Amino acid sequence: MIGFTPPSGIYTHIAGIDLVRTSEKEFFVLEDNVRTPSGVSYMIENRETMYNMFPELFSKIKVRSVTEYPAKLLKALKASSPQLLNDSTVAVLTPGMYNSAYFEHSFLADQMGVELVESQDLQIIDGRVAMRTTQGFKIIDVLYRRVDDMFLDPLSFNENSALGVPGIMDVYKSGTITIANAPGTGIADDKACLLYT
């Protein structure tokens, strides 16, 4: 977004970098995934299964643990809160259960101990994004979105979107919520950008 700096100046909170191994000591970046990177939950689950089946293999070749990923992700998301509070409220925005990565959305929300929300759970109240809870609405400080840019806000992008939150881009521009990753970061996914890295 031209002329706008997101809260904390952070555009890319999470990146999924695809690597290809060309020799024993050489790796190349195949592509960058920063729009809505996906796949980490499968890696965590796969690693846990492999460790349970072959614990001696993991100790023998010194495979690093990935079990701390959800806690580190939550810490990074909270650190990007516009209010910079220790008790910032984080939520994961999912397109819903029919999305191919829904398992990951629910897995990460559960592992981080945050709410998994859909657009109908959210509302703009007094210039803030709030989620419905059994005790009423609760303000969200950081929204880890798993919804593509074009569907994020029907008032700013695709007007037919039922996956986004009407007015969320205005709230974002006001600086009262962090959206991870920032809308527009997907430009870095474009292969043409690899010339400039």
What spans do the regions from the language model cover?
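ATP-dependent carboxylate activation and anion-phosphoryl transfer catalytic cores
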Residues: 1-166, 170-178
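P-loop NTPase catalytic cores that bind/hydrolyze ATP
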Residues: 191-192
